[in-house]
Amino acid sequence: MRLNTLSPAPGRIHAKKRVGRGIGSGLGKTAGRGHKGLKSRSGGSVRPGFEGGQMPLQIRLPKYGFTSRISLVTAEIRLSELNAIEGSVVDIETLKQAGLISSVIKRAKIFASGEVKKAVTVKGLAVTKGAKAAIEAAGGKVEE
């Protein structure tokens, strides 16, 4: 068996419908689109959510919620990602240098996902209870 001899099981692949190629094909002339009307024409279809002029559902329902602007400058860091950082001190600047967060991020929180394999000192970052326990178990410490 070689890659160039592989083929799908018989009946697995259906031939593409070729429309507008004579009445004997069953898809000639109008090509399965019927006669006239919006949907028979090229580019002819109503946009998603259009209900024929009736007030659409997404407009009938009330608006709610908002996007917190502080979430745009906040990042979440996994414990396992701390292993990629050179050195033993972890703060916002070292996270940016390691490429774990973008330059616009101003605050970050470390949460317990994976495991940290080296002793690190966390400075100026929020840390969950589980992550703090894991960092201290690995010989590191968390400073405010």
Curated annotation (Swiss-Prot):
GO molecular function: rRNA binding; structural constituent of ribosome
Gene Ontology annotations for the cellular component aspect, listed alphabetically: cytosolic large ribosomal subunit
Keywords (A to Z) from UniProt: Ribonucleoprotein, Ribosomal protein, RNA-binding, rRNA-binding
Chain residue ranges for the region called Disordered: 24-52
BP GO terms, sorted: translation
Keyword Coiled coil appears in the UniProt entry: no
Domain of life per record: Bacteria
Quaternary structure (record): Part of the 50S ribosomal subunit.
PANTHER family noted in UniProt: 50S RIBOSOMAL PROTEIN L15, LARGE RIBOSOMAL SUBUNIT PROTEIN UL15M
Function as written in the Swiss-Prot or TrEMBL entry: Binds to the 23S rRNA.
Entry similarity comment: Belongs to the universal ribosomal protein uL15 family.
UniProt-listed NCBIfam families: rplO_bact
Annotated protein name in UniProt: Large ribosomal subunit protein uL15
UniProt source species: Cellvibrio japonicus (strain Ueda107)
Biological classification of the source: Bacteria, Pseudomonadati, Pseudomonadota, Gammaproteobacteria, Cellvibrionales
Gene: rplO
